[in-house]
């Protein structure tokens, strides 16, 4: 073909792609996830470079993908549809800063297995291709980074990632943080170091399947949460261990009952949760303060941290909460929502 012609450029793209896919299939058994992702990254880069030919805007447009897809499917089957190649292109454009020229050359050009030792020391991609298909839909870079890190650290399945994104986990955590705290979310995920790190505004309980306008009691809500305990633990966040429901304690010959008692192994403290299906009152806050005081004085060990109290309520008045509680109180109020 005539060097520099459109046909020659497309043929080169196809030839390079075939060689790369054959290479990837040979090494994929050992390094299945990173090989798959790097293959799509490399295809995406070549597609962009072929379309643009060094220009800022694409010169040849979508027909490059259409022609390449047809040829690759003849060679390898249905795994390289137009949609797949479009996703590869989008993936490269989204994450192109992740891969250095040296690493790209070792993988896609030289096809050297020494590149995998670099990946083991510092993996450029930390979740599966299916996760990245979801992550690429997130426009905000900091938010996208947060969900990627949390997916890897918490072992989220793709379905869990979708649920956490749909419930606006990033925004709910960000609401209780300052600017530096929000930046840290994007770089490190949700690091649990202090009581404020476990609070979400609001707490989303859509998995209970309860109607928003239906009349229900605190016992109904509590029962629904226990029946869906695994999903409730996911919504609460990291480090939670369930201890008891309606935990009774006796003080001065009077019995009291805490709705839900958890232990957070990351914060090394008890977490008491009281459920309120109406607007939060100062009496509710005072009651939780008494529960927390009791646990701090009679239940927690010397080397454990102070007890945390969380009031899950239908509605709250932030000014009322602030004026009722002392500044150093380990008690938090969070509204719950029964729908996303």
Predicted regions and their residues:
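Basic, low-complexity intrinsically disordered segments
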Residues: 5-6, 10-340
